[in-house]
Amino acid sequence: MGNDSNQAQARINALLDENSFVELQSLVTSRSTDFNLDAKKEPSDGVIIGHGLIDGTLVFVFSQNADVLGGTIGEMHAKKILSLYDMALKVGAPVIGFIDCGGVRLQESFDALEALGSVIERAADVKGVIPQLICVAGQCGGGLSVLPALADFTFMVDGASLFINSPDTITGNRSDECDTSSAKFQFEEAGTVDKIGSLDEVIASMRQVISMIPNDIVVVFSNTTVQKHQCFGAQLSSQSNCHIHT
């Protein structure tokens, strides 16, 4: 799996039941604007989204592709993730994300920043309404690092990095002495990550978590307000045996 030419798709295939994945919005690419006159039309704009099954349970998945423009976030890239959250919310299904990102696409300027902000806002809005699982599979820095913090369960693959600012920007700290972005530090010291390990180990834990999540979550819309008839957080906390085996 580690040598697969398309890591983003390989992660999805490893997570979901065989032949259950349905990709959505595969033809979406970046658009030309005043900020981005020479937009590159790259495959899926650097992120694969869709839905599939884990032991028969419906889940919605996004996976960033670091092979496309370094996995950077552009306007349409972020809007694809935003639309995935909206679809998952309508049916009360979990959202699972694989992050492998090179930051915001600077050439798209405020369009990319606004779209990224919308994703973070939506993740905050649905917290406790639908389950969110985030796996940092590569680099996750800057504004996108907020997304793992909002997730109900956060995972990191060995060798991945999670940070807002580079460790070297902290006075007196150097990454070769104390890499505060490493999976080991985030798990043992910061406590922001629930599970670390190889990709196979992390995916096994993610599948285990999905198997323990109630599948009768009902979300009712009232204008722009989301009402929680059966709150995911309340149901999950009531399950005393709900933990991740390490």
Predicted regions mapped to residue ranges:
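Terminal-region recognition feature
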Residues: M1-L133, L144-V146, L150-S161, T180-T246
